[in-house]
Amino acid sequence: MKALSRLLPAALAIACLASPAALAASFDCSKASTLVETAVCTAPTLSVKDEQLSALYQPLQHQKVFRELQRRWLREVRNLCKSAICLENAYDQQIERLTPAQPNPQAEAPTLRPSSDQQPYLQITDAPWQRFALATVPGVNPHLYTQVVDVAILDGVLNVVVFVGEHVDQTVRNAGNSYEKRYFGSLYEYSDARSGLHPIVRDIRFSGWNNIGANDQGERYAGIIDGVFYYRHRVKGEAEQSMAYTLGSKEQPQPSTQLFSAESGAKRFSKAMIATDLNYDNTNVMLHYPYERDGNTYDRVMDKNDNGWSVVNPMWNQTRPVLYFDNSGDFACVWRVDLVNKTLEKIVPEHEAVSAVPVDVLGQEALVYLEGDKLMFTIAPQQ
């Protein structure tokens, strides 16, 4: 292939010809207006890659996540290229990003063992995860209790349920237990195929977790199963009612005899045991491997001399040996604990980031979280 440095000056002197290679690009080459577009039209291999990428993107473009990923790729990667090799690599990168990852049933799960030297995990503070806002959460201020309740992919589309607690229900609060409380508030749904958040129900006494507001909020009582969001709310005194809402239906939630119940974030999908109760000591994370019989059975994730940790909202990835948590101490942001590579990565640096929940998008690792009044999305860098 010609080097782009030789290709681009030629593109300035002659119009893009309507050759078979040119017509293979995903856009009208007769209207190519930039040097990069002209280069794509003129180079046969780039035209093929552009067409391949377009075929992947077209069925996804109704979803905000993919529109934003494509926009950023164009602005920050492709359109900055100055060589043919750069363009080739840029297209390969985005084609890989938009290609659904195929599960490999033959792949063996990695063997998880504690570090032999008992050293803290390698700390990485500049992990290059892309992140951007999905929607604005209505009625949020710093004094409100706001949480991502659950996340699911339905028919290929990201769906999120958010709770905004507006004030504490004083009628059932146990003064002797700061976590024995409920909030009056509203539930909202987000679908990546339509803009904004939409109310599911307003002004309910929401019972989403056993220890609402705790570092580890305990057993979960609200979540998505097969496209239906189940939750509980207090109707009178200590009486609770289970409700069901079909995501995207815009209909009123209906009473349900089916209950949602799941383990706490510290335990659900766990690949090792968090050795301490984070509601009593959340200044570090120790991971215990109970099946290890010889030698050390613990991993120390943080340096014991670091004083900036206040670990909240632990959440395990369902399929990967990865733990996430928010940190409300001096190291505030969202962190990722990789049990295979023994790394502790800061993946969201903003101090306001909270309530991170993992999700796979096209088989790729991603998170949904809250930052102020914004519902946010972040996705892992490509390997």
Which residues are covered by each model-predicted region?
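Short loop/turn motifs at secondary-structure junctions
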Residues: 11-12, 343
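N-terminal alpha-helical modules
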Residues: 23-116, 170-178, 239, 376-380
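Sequence signature of WD/YWTD-type beta-propeller architectures
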Residues: 107-383
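N-terminal signal peptide c-region/cleavage motif recognized by signal peptidases
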Residues: 19-21
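Bacterial N-terminal signal peptides that target proteins for export
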Residues: 1-11
